[in-house]
Amino acid sequence: MSLTPPKSQYVIALDVGGTRIKAALIGSGGSGTELLYETRRATDREGGPDAVVEGILDVAGQLRTYGIEQYGTGPAAAGVAVPGILDEPTGTAVYAANLGWRDVPLRTLLTRRLGGLPVALGHDVRTGGLAEGRIGAGKGVDRFLFVALGTGIAGAIGIDGRLEPGAHGSAGELGHIVVRPGGPECGCGQRGCLEALASAGAVGRAWAAASGDVSAGAADAARAVESNDDRAIAIWRDAVDALAAGLVTALTLLDPRTVIIGGGLAEAGDILFVPLREAVRARVTFQQLPMIVPAALGDAAGCLGAGLLARDLLSAEVSSR
């Protein structure tokens, strides 16, 4: 936290997750992503979608008030990253299973709560990918693919400093590439999806079943691999093989120069990256092998990306005048 007044405009940044909201005030020092103040709060899913929305509006309002009190001027804009399906042109959060909402006019609600402030809305994984591409592991790379391995799996396609949302806002849903036809059932209704086999959630469930520890997760599986537990090694090898299959499909279609891997499973470090690089290399034929690197920004990527969205919005407004 810093109480130093920002050198110029600062923005509100929100990263809304299934369990918590990460929020920050971001100044324009250095790369334009100077963290001036950070806070976190529970998402309050138990209270239902209305409570989730009110929590977002409340923390945004608190950040605006804090900024005015500390710096003597209000924020210039706000950026918010949310999960699920978005209609970015209208600023509508169309659907998010983990938050329970449908067709929430989130940009309008935030603009109203923030006294008319311009608000940018973005998909959480694409927003994290934006930050990694501009100021993180993909900085200076013209074509990259950011893949988040968390409870699920999703990707973001980076092209010359911007993220490609697709025609309907669903580009990069790598988790629902079928890599094992007839495999485990996925939440989307298909079987054998990458997400059902290689996400941190899938690895954690497999290790919990194998170890008999119902509270075990992917991090426990990684530690067991380090300890040369044969059961964990088999589970890990299966997940890495599935992930390599999904990545080769993606690089065949997209031809990225760099693949950036983030999310909880990436925290395993070389336990993941060494066999994954080998598995991808073994599968490619005519494709150019990309660099496969860990994400650099950790769980700050979403907030930093939301700040970049807000700054892009300001830049667009200036250029349109």
Residue ranges with predicted function:
Residues 15, 79-83, 146-152, 156-158:
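Short beta-strand segments
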Residues 1-77, 87-90, 108-119, 131-142, ...:
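ATP-binding/phosphotransfer module of carbohydrate and carboxylate kinases, centering on a glycine-rich
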Residues 105:
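A conserved beta-strand->loop->alpha-helix hinge within the catalytic CA
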Residues 91-102:
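A charged helix-plus-loop insertion that forms the helical arch/lid used to bind
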Residues 121-123:
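Short loop/edge segments at beta-strand edges and connector loops
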Residues 20, 127, 151-154:
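Conserved A3 ("GATE") glycine/threonine-rich loop of ANL adenylate-forming enzymes
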Residues 170-173:
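Structural signature of FAD isoalloxazine-binding scaffolds in flavoprotein oxidoreductases
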